[in-house]
Amino acid sequence: MINMRKTHPLLKIINHSFIDLPAPSNISAWWNFGSLLGVCLIIQILTGLFLAMHYTSDTLTAFSSVAHICRDVNYGWLLRNLHANGASMFFMCLFLHVGRGIYYGSYLYKETWNIGVILLLTVMAMAFVGYVLPWGQMSFWGATVITNLLSAIPYIGTTLAEWIWGGFAVDKATLTRFFAFHFILPFIIMALAIVHLLFLHETGSNNPSGINPDSDKIPFHPYYTIKDALGFMFLLLILLLLALFSPDLLGDPDNFSPANPLNTPPHIKPEWYFLFAYAILRSIPNKLGGVLALLASILILLIIPLLHTANQRSMMFRPVSQTLFWILTANLMTLTWIGGQPVEQPFIIIGQLASMLYFTLILVLMLFAGLFENYMLKPKW
């Protein structure tokens, strides 16, 4: 009798995606982050679902409903801590996943890469609307500052901002719709992730060497299911350490105060995973210019495949590109640090230099590094 997993219409799809899938034999731990992101998404959906059962999206009761979840709901404190820190783990995995894609040239699978960039933008939107829900000081002022950026768009900006707010400022209508968006977006992300996988399985996985691996493939199960399971254990260990020992480590103390439109916090900043983009936004002293730079900092990923000039796909054997890649990584860490600092010297100038270097590295230096490496590899006799 033929194995049911190979004949059943539904099981057959799962079999081709996770069991009998031919995978390169040499993919490293950097290829674990895709499955880790899937686990993060499932954790966030499950904890979020239970939180939504007790949360009320009303300006008068939102803050106290979160306090009620932590104090009165069975394991509510754990659900809230897992959900809040799960978002941080999600973004940590996302950044490492994108970094892996850039380092090993995975962006040359253009459809997979483009869906990935759309996924990144959608996850950022989901995290932003989610951060507003507890209705603390930083939730309210973060929402006010970021949605206000829409008013920088010529002609339609003010109308657009008021349309998003559902009034003349961030208020009850804004909170209610943000809760609705935050509930629906994870399912949209799940659908996009399936499309992302669909495109990936059209071409097969890339590998560290960047060489076509078709001559040496192994089945996904048991080799990579075991490898992924090890990754899951590490992820859950770090998440539980965060959620149980220092749940407020990555949060902002201002969010323990209920939202007050009459009292502005001394320093408005988003969660750590948005700080690099926030630093780029602030480094341009013009509202519209800042908004465009903010968008460009993410959308620049879409043109990375067009900037690939090297004869080799991966950076594994390209030391000049490797050096620039790690400078870019250090630069992003610098931007993250600057985004959390007050707007005063020397932070302003450091932020401006780091923002300029970010775009220069990607648009100019990476491009010429590939051409230079091609030239150096040419036989000189």
UniProtKB/Swiss-Prot annotation:
Cofactor(s) required, per the database record: heme b
Cofactor notes: Binds 2 heme b groups non-covalently.
Cysteine-cysteine disulfides: none
TM region positions: 33-53, 77-98, 113-133, 178-198, 226-246, 288-308, 320-340, 347-367
PROSITE patterns: CYTB_CTER (PS51003), CYTB_NTER (PS51002)
Subcellular location: Mitochondrion inner membrane
Main location: mitochondrion
Keyword field: Electron transport, Heme, Iron, Membrane, Metal-binding, Mitochondrion, Mitochondrion inner membrane, Respiratory chain, Transmembrane, Transmembrane helix, Transport, Ubiquinone
Annotated binding of heme b b562, by residue: H83, H182
Note: Heme 1 (or BL or b562) is low-potential and absorbs at about 562 nm, and heme 2 (or BH or b566) is high-potential and absorbs at about 566 nm.
Function of the molecule: Component of the ubiquinol-cytochrome c reductase complex (complex III or cytochrome b-c1 complex) that is part of the mitochondrial respiratory chain. The b-c1 complex mediates electron transfer from ubiquinol to cytochrome c. Contributes to the generation of a proton gradient across the mitochondrial membrane that is then used for ATP synthesis.
Quaternary organization: The cytochrome bc1 complex contains 11 subunits: 3 respiratory subunits (MT-CYB, CYC1 and UQCRFS1), 2 core proteins (UQCRC1 and UQCRC2) and 6 low-molecular weight proteins (UQCRH/QCR6, UQCRB/QCR7, UQCRQ/QCR8, UQCR10/QCR9, UQCR11/QCR10 and a cleavage product of UQCRFS1). This cytochrome bc1 complex then forms a dimer.
Designated name of the protein: Cytochrome b
Name of the gene encoding the protein in the UniProt record: MT-CYB
